[in-house]
């Protein structure tokens, strides 16, 4: 296995222009494919998850032109649901942002589809979405294990009506159903069961859907009413925001090491909830400056925090490694859905934090981290999880090197992450 050893980083300073958001990129690509008209997406993320979506759309008959650097994509929309002429098997890697929304969208039209992916994808639940789709008239079956991919889907259309979706495990189930619902033949009322996790990701979905011209009534995140027989309309140009989750590593680096880091591509007008990561850093003692399309972090004296991170679970991972540099014990709470991400992130994070010397308590939906007097050099296993690799790169901001196993796993969202980190540390 390839590994990368990062030597201690003595200073951090500079500016980072963020790659496009994974969450925004894949949502916008799917809606552009379903829309009438042509959409030109700029600042599209070039990563594994986006390639899986693009490959699936091409197989489904969608025409698009991708720039040489793969950050601009002109999509000619179908103006309708997918209706390929032949049965298709679509391999979606470990891309939840492709698997869940496509599973819903493929129910709308005609055709037979198998959706599959990497072994980890077959361990990531999808049952709550499938149950809701079946209630709206979909024909979906599990090919291996109940409630998990791979799926076999026969396009029958969705008839809407009142459906329930469990929101307690992943907001992607609701996102997927919301994006399909406007093309249903009858009005759809979606009732949320349990506490809805990651609400800011639903805000991203609703914002992009509105940009593509459809109407939804959001009743305090408990009920969503979606009128029937709507059509997505291409907005023309669509700028993909920078990835706010990816910003967290650079902002944290400034907070830990000093100097000043300016991150552009997100700001106080961002539609991504993960920009709130900067507020968590501020609570730890970092000086934060906000602009419309930038965030600046400057060194503070980092103190431990005890905080509910249900709203920003991805960015919360960065707090776990920043906690290694904070005074006191940090508690990250209400993050059960870490367990159903690219890996079981609670177990993985606890294991790897202990390797560098931290005292860690891992609960069902929380983790507490007490830093050691000095960090130990360790080889960090990344579990084919891009965020594990990027989070633990921050250990190099100490006086100790850190070895990252399988550093290439960052290709899921940020292929040149380690190059960007090096630019800030030169």
Swiss-Prot record:
3-phosphoshikimate binds at residues 22-23, 27, 170-172, 198, 314, 337, 341. The keyword Disulfide bond does not apply. It comes from the Bacteria. SUPFAM superfamilies: EPT/RTPC-like. Its EC number is 2.5.1.19. InterPro entries: Enolpyruvate_Tfrase_dom, Enolpyruvate_Tfrase_sf, EPSP_synthase, EPSP_synthase_CS, RNA3'P_cycl/enolpyr_Trfase_a/b. Pathway: Metabolic intermediate biosynthesis; chorismate biosynthesis; chorismate from D-erythrose 4-phosphate and phosphoenolpyruvate: step 6/7. It is an enzyme of class 2 (transferase). The active site is at 314 (proton acceptor). It holds the Pfam family EPSP_synthase. NCBIfam families: aroA. Monomer. HAMAP family: EPSP_synth (MF_00210). This is 3-phosphoshikimate 1-carboxyvinyltransferase. It comes from Aliivibrio fischeri (strain MJ11). The lineage of its organism: Bacteria, Pseudomonadati, Pseudomonadota, Gammaproteobacteria, Vibrionales.
């Amino acid at each position: 296995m390839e590994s990368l050893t990062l030597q201690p980083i003595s200073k951090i300073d500079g500016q980072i222009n963020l790659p496009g958001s994974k969450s925004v990129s894949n949502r916008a690509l799917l809606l552009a494919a379903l829309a009438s008209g042509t959409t030109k997406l700029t600042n599209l993320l070039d990563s594994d998850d986006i390639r899986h979506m693009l490959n699936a759309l091409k197989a489904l008959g969608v025409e698009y032109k991708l720039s040489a650097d793969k950050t601009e994509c002109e999509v000619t929309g179908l103006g309708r649901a997918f209706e390929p002429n032949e049965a298709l098997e679509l391999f979606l890697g470990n891309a939840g942002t492709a698997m869940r929304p496509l599973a819903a969208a493929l129910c709308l039209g005609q055709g037979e589809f198998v959706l599959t992916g990497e072994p980890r994808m077959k361990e990531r639940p999808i049952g709550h979405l499938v149950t809701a789709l079946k209630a709206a008239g979909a024909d979906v079956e599990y090919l291996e294990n109940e409630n998990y991919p791979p799926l076999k889907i026969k396009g029958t259309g969705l008839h809407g009506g009142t459906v329930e979706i469990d929101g307690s495990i992943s907001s992607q189930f609701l996102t997927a159903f919301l994006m399909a619902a406007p093309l249903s033949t009858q009005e759809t009322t979606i009732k949320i069961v349990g506490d809805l996790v990651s609400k800011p990701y639903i805000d991203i979905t609703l914002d992009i859907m509105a940009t593509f011209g459809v109407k939804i009534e959001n009743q305090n995140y408990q009920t969503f009413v979606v009128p029937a027989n709507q059509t997505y309309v291409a907005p023309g140009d669509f700028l993909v925001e920078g990835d706010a989750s990816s910003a967290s590593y650079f902002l944290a680096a400034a907070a830990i090491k000093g100097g000043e880091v300016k991150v552009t591509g997100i700001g106080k007008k961002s539609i991504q909830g993960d920009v709130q990561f900067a507020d968590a850093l501020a609570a730890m003692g970092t000086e934060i400056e906000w602009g419309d399309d930038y965030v600046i972090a400057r060194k503070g004296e980092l103190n431990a925090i005890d905080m509910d991170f249900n709203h920003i679970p991805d960015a919360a991972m960065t707090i776990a490694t920043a906690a290694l540099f904070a005074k006191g014990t940090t508690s990250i709470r209400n993050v059960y859905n870490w367990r159903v991400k690219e890996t079981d992130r609670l177990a993985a994070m606890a294991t790897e934090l202990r390797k560098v010397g931290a005292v860690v308590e891992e609960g069902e939906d929380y983790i507490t981290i007490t830093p050691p007097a000095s960090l130990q050099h360790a080889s960090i296993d990344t579990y084919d999880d891009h965020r594990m690799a990027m989070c633990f790169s921050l250990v190099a901001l100490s006086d100790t090197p850190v070895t990252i196993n399988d550093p290439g796993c960052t290709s899921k969202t940020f292929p040149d992450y380690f190059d960007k980190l090096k630019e800030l540390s030169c």
